[in-house]
């Protein structure tokens, strides 16, 4: 009796909807029957939502919302997005509520294992970083935290970068100064020091023919030749192309242009590496110097 009374009281008191309901019921068409069924379904859902328990109302709400969307599409009205979102949220809640206790426990275990693996990988990475970092391990140093390890790694990387830049600058300055000191065009005053070690071994010219990396054996052995021999060897080797100043050429008048440059350490540039003299210049040598050069070469 209570349900019938609630059903009667839920109907509107105005006669217009009742007449529309009877007119739609009397029609024999399928569309009218479908429309009447949809209208009655709407009234039943509106009457039973307030009287049903929460679980039943949630199920009826989700079912009637889906049915309402279909009816609206048939009648040609626009479907609202709020009803669709409420239906999806209700279905998701229903799925979660329908999960049994073992399934929920399995889901919790999967989530916990994934989180545990992530933290394990992070700890392994931090331990590897602490191993290669200075000041991060020792007998009197306790294990650093993750934030302290990252800050120490950042400072260490910045320090290494600054040290590398400073080392590059120093190396460039050292090699630049070395090249300027040994190059005759950049430093003409240093040619005397280059040519000074040559007369230091007058008695042993042939015993060390291969010590000089660039000069040929004949040119190295001619350091002990007096007077005419030196002038003849000077005629063999042309003057260095970089000796443009006359003062630099007059620094050692007894030696050729090539001997003014070559000293203890040769210049590494390709222009200073003079090739061996050609054979047709040897014919211009004097008769006294040629036998001595041949004996020195042996």
Swiss-Prot record:
Residues 1-13 have a biased composition (Polar residues). Coiled coil: none annotated. Keywords: DNA-binding, Nucleus, Transcription, Transcription regulation. The gene is OLIG2. Residues 1-60, 79-102 are annotated as: Disordered. GO terms for molecular function: DNA-binding transcription factor activity, RNA polymerase II-specific; E-box binding; HMG box domain binding; identical protein binding; protein dimerization activity. It comes from Gallus gallus. It is found in: Nucleus. Residues 26-41 have a biased composition (Gly residues). GO terms for cellular component: cytoplasm; nucleus. CDD domains: bHLH_TS_OLIG2. GO terms for biological process: axon development; myelination; negative regulation of neuron differentiation; negative regulation of transcription by RNA polymerase II; neuron fate commitment; positive regulation of oligodendrocyte differentiation; positive regulation of transcription by RNA polymerase II; sensory organ development. InterPro entries: bHLH_dom, bHLH_transcription_factors, HLH_DNA-bd_sf, Olig2_bHLH. Required for oligodendrocyte and motor neuron specification in the spinal cord. Residues 106-160 form the bHLH domain. The keyword Amino-acid biosynthesis does not apply. It comes from the Eukaryota. This is Oligodendrocyte transcription factor 2. Residues 79-91 have a biased composition (Low complexity).
